[in-house]
Amino acid sequence: MSDELRKRGTTPIANIRNFSIVAHIDHGKSTLADRLIQMTGGLSDREMAGKEQVLDSMDIERERGITIKAQTVRLNYHAKDGKDYIFNLMDTPGHVDFAYEVSRSLAACEGSLLVVDASQGVEAQTLANVYQALDNNHEIVPVLNKVDLPAAEPDKVKQQIEDVIGIDASDAVMISAKTGLGVPDVLEAIVTRLPPPQGDRDATLKALLVDSWYDVYLGVVVLVRIVDGVMKKNSRIRMMGTNAAYDVERVGFFTPKMQQVDELGPGEIGFITAAIKEVADTRVGDTITDDRKPITEMLPGFKPAIPVVFCGLFPVDADDFETLRTAMGKLRLNDASFSFEMETSAALGFGFRCGFLGLLHLEIIQERLSREFDLNLIATAPSVIYKMKLTDGGEIEIHNPIDMPDVVKIAEIAEPWIEATILTPDDYLGSVLKLCQERRGSQKELTYVGSRAMVRYDLPLNEVVFDFYDRLKSVSKGYASFDYHLTDYKVADLVKMQILVNGEPVDALSMLVHRTRAEGRGRAMVEKMKELIPPHMFQIPIQAAIGGKVIARETVRALRKDVTAKCYGGDITRKRKLLEKQKEGKKKMRQFGKVDIPQEAFIAALKVDG
């Protein structure tokens, strides 16, 4: 490619290929991205040495082997037909919680490489992401990875791709991303089998905001896909969703190193910076246009990310509250889908009520807070958004059981339901179905693909957020995979269960549960609390109650001083008098004594499977 072209940053649109890699967690997506970068010279072998998953920039992404933020890289490739091509590779997350990151990355591309592990076969999240790619009219090239493993069964997996997804896999590319085997064939398949983007260079600027993140030096960096027109340095742009205008300071792309250019043309993917203060000002999926002659219609199909799961996060040490507030603010800079507001709890002090996209999102935020900011946190039981109709005709939404109005004021409570797709080897099907049944699920369909079963279930989200994923993995020995999407709200017989310690309700342990499961959950929680609350000088009753009705109770026995030790022989009334006096003292203590509940008791009670 000529220096002139490289400087301008624009390329003939027919020589551009925008594609994403779609795969289930751990099927080798980021490793394949590494090989593509290496073989096209994006980074030298020396720079790649000792580095795996170049595009996974967070430590936690590398450690868990998952991709959280969508990443992009631009590669130059000299094809066998003698032409120079530009590849824009979008590395997307594979986990269900980050499905919105996937959807907008896919909207910026025309094709996808579907990477399937030849030893594992198609998994539930592969399905979800492929369907999203097909919804975006993507051309799909199947790639079978890990074909060098002894357990690989490429022919069986090809058949499975055709049966489950319904796309022709006869000419799937066979590779081993780890060793680089077959990767040159992938590069050629991108050129020959994926379509170039469409776009008009002379039209008014129209660009899709794909992602944004905060950089300490540059402020907010915005990842864009140019649809029509040209994005130039020093031009003035407008975000159509927020109606805010900015002056573009830098324009460029990643190779994965940052390269600045003067302009980006139609079909290209790159970044801009424009003195934007907060990531919250850049809505993902928004349309960017020219401020001087704006277009009227936004690009279709994007909605803001809405939190689905909520929980309270409290610092173990109350002095860490300000540090936690600052840390959350910093994480929110890079993650607009994470929301939080302050809350107080009588048991845990000051903390925050946080909203997440799902359980993995919650876990990752929690882990980042403890790892990057060295914070020790307690998380309360995760809950979902409930809709309540009141007797006076009003409607409210709550996600914190503490905010629930008096029972007499509530006409009905509705909870969110999901449709779950579970793929499991048929040996474990029985225990998977039993688990879904226990969680109030209703089966929609059951089909077999080879030796694996695909089950669709309707389940209440409330039953899934708690520990469903862990239980599913344990009943299937880790082989089942799971994907879900929200469907609608259904009215349910839900009750607010409280845990009382020494007659006092512990607000952090309140939860909304289905009436049929309340007793089991309550009993399990009080038994756990009994094990972990140390004995005091007086006995402590631990109760689980619904309204005024106690449904389970355990008692922590009192420590007792032997007050009669000094009485040798003598009259029995002397002993009795001392024992009566002790009894009086205990009674008084129980009335005014404060019970110290250790942090472990909270954490263990919340993890109980009732």
From Swiss-Prot:
Q: Name a Pfam family for this protein.
A: GTP_EFTU_D2
Question: Which E.C. number(s) belong to this protein?
Answer: 3.6.5.n1
Q: Which GO terms describe its molecular function?
A: GTP binding; GTPase activity; guanosine tetraphosphate binding; ribosome binding; translation elongation factor activity
Protein's cellular compartments:
Cell inner membrane
Q: How does it sit in the membrane?
A: Peripheral membrane protein
- State its role: Required for accurate and efficient protein synthesis under certain stress conditions. May act as a fidelity factor of the translation reaction, by catalyzing a one-codon backward translocation of tRNAs on improperly translocated ribosomes. Back-translocation proceeds from a post-translocation (POST) complex to a pre-translocation (PRE) complex, thus giving elongation factor G a second chance to translocate the tRNAs correctly. Binds to ribosomes in a GTP-dependent manner.
Q: Which PANTHER family match?
A: TRANSLATION FACTOR GUF1 HOMOLOG, CHLOROPLASTIC, TRANSLATION FACTOR GUF1-RELATED
Specify the protein name: Elongation factor 4
